[in-house]
Amino acid sequence: MAEMMRIRNQADLATGLEALLDIDPRLHAIARQAGPLPLRLTEPGFEGLAFIIVSQMVSRASADAIWRRLCEAMGTAEPAAYLALGDAALSLGLSRAKHACLSGLASAVQAGDIDLFAILDQPVETGIAELTRLRGIGLWTSEVYLMFCGGHADVFPAGDVALRAAVGDGLCLATRPDIRETTRIALTWRPYRAIAARLFWAFYAARLRREAAPVPV
């Protein structure tokens, strides 16, 4: 099996971006507007995945605010601390669906039913299959976890609305591409799709002056 490409530091990101621009010269203009790309790596494990779950379908500002309240209430972002909150977590800004998802995740980690570190060393498809068997964790959440907690270089979360908007805008498409079309477009950028995603999130932020990437810098 070929070694998986990983983004572990800013040098990896810079090297990958250079290769990406060679693959698709259309991206040069987007890169100029986007400016420097943040690495955005975050710690793997329950804390990293829990933050991504909190970030589902809300603005970055809202996700950050909810997460701060959760961390204050938990004291430490660990499965046992989350489970100890019980339904009090609902008063901190979580929907019932997200609370159920986080509770299920915490229970699975505590029981040893899933190893959130080991799956990062598996092929992307295997990691996604392991994560999506848990209640409330879908493709977007799995892909974002593999990208930003595992450094996988060839993942593109086409379900991300801001990312699709940025692709449509940056490539001057007549309409915003849907998930299927965005996935097809992103095939051009293999094996650097996670770098392309970072590029388009940075482009979105530069154009709209609003952060949309699912994890902080």
Task: Locate predicted features.
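C-terminal accessory module of base-excision DNA glycosylases/AP lyases that mediates lesion recognition
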Residues: 1-37, 125, 139-217
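A positional/architectural concept
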Residues: 15, 21-52, 57, 61-75
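Structural motif
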Residues: 39-47, 92-97, 186-194
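A broad detector of the eukaryotic-type serine/threonine protein kinase catalytic domain
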Residues: 54, 87, 110, 114, ...
